[in-house]
Amino acid sequence: MKYFIAFHGLCCIMKKIYGLFERMCYIMCKFIPKLIFFNGAELLEGPCWDAETESLYFVSIKADTVFRFNTKTGRIKSYATDGAVGCAVLRDGKLITAEKSGIYERKIDDTEKQLIAHVYDDNIYRYNDGKLDPKGRLFVGTMGDGERQTGKCGLYRIDGENEFTCVVSGTTISNGLGWTKDSSKMFFIDTPTKEVWEFDYDLETGEISNKKVFTKIEDGAPDGMCVDIDDTLWIAHWGGSKVSHWDSRTGEYLGEIELPVSRVSCPVVGGKMMDTLYITTALDPDGNEPLSGGLFAVKIR
């Protein structure tokens, strides 16, 4: 009997060890990014998830192209733009694109587009990252087109046709944006500062106030960003080969996802169960990273 009890106890211990090993393997596999799209793009950016069609929109800035990737079928559709395109977002069933010559709106799959607004007059600028706030207002940033325009760019709120407001001035490379679930906070990145800024946000007016530094990124520079349904931040590290994860309420660092490329540009949460992080990247100019410039996906829950 005592041998049976000892054997039974050993089996229980082995079962627990196996369970822990299985869990560790699951966690390790869960956070391994997989390449899901590659065409040698110089700079992929601005992923935007469309839950209705389970499709991902993203832009190839230097190729003047918007892509739509249907995650159910694997089919890709592309839209040509008028010069460099900084971002593409969906609103009321229409596609909004921030192109070199202006911000446009069009019906999905329609070639005709309507100019909404244009915030700069000089060709030394272009649009960069942009997103809709929880009320559907477009916020879009600017940067130098080719030559850096230090402190001369900004983040703009598009208030209507040919109506816009500069909400953050004096930026250099306006980048990541995101809002908390209750719309009380907005986060924003001006990449060269290496800082992620936090603002109080008034959803009714679209006004920001009480700027403070949420965190400073030391490994690479912060690029694109998103806020998930748990109010945590995912921040792309340009030159840092990863996406870091943060608690928006406490500022606590929660972990990171490493990628096989250095120039990580922007993440977005998507998938049928909102359990997948899609990550755009840019080409390695030295040619040492064969997967650079690809689109990656990784399960996060």
Regions from the PLM with identified roles:
Residues 28-40, 71, 211:
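A short helix->beta-strand "capping" segment at the edge of beta-propeller domains
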Residues 40, 51, 56-62, 95-101, ...:
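Conserved beta-strand positions in repeat-built beta-propeller and related beta-rich domains
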Residues 65-67, 102, 154-156, 195-197, ...:
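A short loop-to-beta-strand structural motif that recurs across blades of beta-propeller domains
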Residues 71, 91-93, 108-109, 156-163, ...:
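Flexible "stalk/tail and boundary" regions
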Residues 199-206, 300-301:
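Short loop/turn segments immediately following beta-strands, especially the blade-tip
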Residues 205-269:
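Glycine/small-residue-rich hydrophobic helix-like segments
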Residues 269-301:
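Blade-level signature of beta-propeller repeat domains, shared across WD40, Kelch, NHL, RCC1
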